[in-house]
Regions:
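Electrostatic, structured charged patches in enzyme active sites and in nucleic-acid/phosphate-binding
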Residues: 1-231
Length: 231
């Protein structure tokens, strides 16, 4: 009989924790969501995005090995703009990392950054950030989002949906025995687990147990090498 604490027991994803909700029908936003389970949380949760650019940024952030938690649309912050006027700004994401640092993330198209002189505005926002809100402020435009890296991050998020601890441990043992670079196919064949091993190797790359070029599509033919510091 399936227990409610079994891994196979279905649980609907937790709702978004966004501080701002966008209307389902809007000419200004294209609302979507990403299912994610961060190290800080026990269950999968919806992370809302107002644009494809935000969704891509979300996926790339979730793929960071040192990420602890990710919040979308956190509470707005007040600042004095370059004209001396009091204004508020709501960041798109607030990321918490395992070293306890916090990074506020603004996502904007490069053209809008230029037309709004947003980099100067962001400096004013950074200057007036409330104590403890964030240690750093970053701006993400399409220049920072490599399309192949985004696709790899999306595949990683998909592979994380179904945990496979046995495959992860077997692949981890194989990695410990590696002394030189090789293909993912070689690791998969050595494991005898087929697609399960491919998914485990993929996860191991983003756990920084293996090095690989994430700006190339990760396939069975991809070259990987062991990371000595993670063995």
């Amino acid at each position: 009989m399936t227990k409610d604490y079994d891994d196979d027991f279905y649980r609907p994803p937790m709702p978004t924790v966004a501080g701002l909700m966008f209307p389902a029908r809007s000419k200004l936003t294209v609302r979507g969501f990403t299912l994610a389970k961060t190290p800080a949380e026990k269950y999968w949760r919806q992370i809302i995005s107002a644009s494809q650019a935000e969704r891509e940024t979300c996926l790339l952030t979730l793929a960071m090995p040192n990420l602890w938690n990710l919040f979308e649309q956190p509470e707005p912050v007040s600042f004095v703009d370059v004209d001396g006027k009091q204004r508020t700004h709501r960041f798109d994401y607030l990321a918490e990392f395992k070293d306890r640092s916090r990074v506020a993330i603004a996502v904007k198209p490069e053209a809008r950054v230029y037309s709004l002189n947003f980099r100067q505005t962001l400096q004013a926002i950074k200057r007036d950030l409330p104590m403890g809100f964030a240690d750093r402020v970053v701006l993400v435009t399409e220049r920072e989002r490599h399309p192949v890296e985004v696709r790899n991050a999306e595949l990683l998020n998909f592979f994380r949906r179904r945990t496979d601890r046995d495959a992860d441990l077997i692949v981890r043992d194989i990695i410990k025995q590696l002394s030189a670079e090789g293909t993912i196919a070689e690791l998969v064949d050595k494991s005898g687990l087929g697609a399960r091993a491919f998914r485990a190797v993929f996860r191991a790359i983003y756990d920084e147990r293996l090095s690989a070029n994430k700006r190339e599509t990760i396939t069975r033919n991809s070259i990987v090498s062991p990371r000595k510091d993670k063995k």
